[in-house]
């Protein structure tokens, strides 16, 4: 995502109000990412349990977003501690709901069913579903690539 938004060489900065997210020069989209917090971009981030939960809390509570029209949170597929932590932290804000993202492959079907069940059990509205990596049409020649 950092490459698509042209922020791969930008770092999160700390201000008196909290962390200042990176901002895409092309789209004005503010991005807060673990990748922007580490010095070596090729390093793996291996956080588990409480350390991961604390980082999520800090990213949500200590980031100075300014005025937002909406907040998108990119999470790993499935239903995990990350999802529970985020939902617990945002519950008082009464989020409008979730936009689920899946791929067109058959193995993704079970995962998306679990995510739908998770949203239902947590009383979180599903706003929509995005099918990712289905195909693209070349803007130069018009050829469809699956």
Residue ranges and their predicted role:
Residues 70-146:
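Conserved catalytic-core segment of NTP-binding enzymes
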Residues 11, 21-26, 63-66, 91-94, ...:
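Solvent-exposed alpha-helices and their adjacent loops that cap or buttress functional pockets
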Residues 34-40, 94-97:
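A short small-residue
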Residues 1-38, 53, 57:
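Phosphate-binding loop that captures ATP/GTP phosphates
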Residues 8, 46-50, 143-145:
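Short, flexible loop segments at the rims of nucleotide/cofactor-binding pockets, characterized by
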Residues 37-89:
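Phosphate-binding/switch loop-helix module in NTP-utilizing enzymes
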Residues 3, 61, 120:
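Short polybasic/polar patches that bind polyanions
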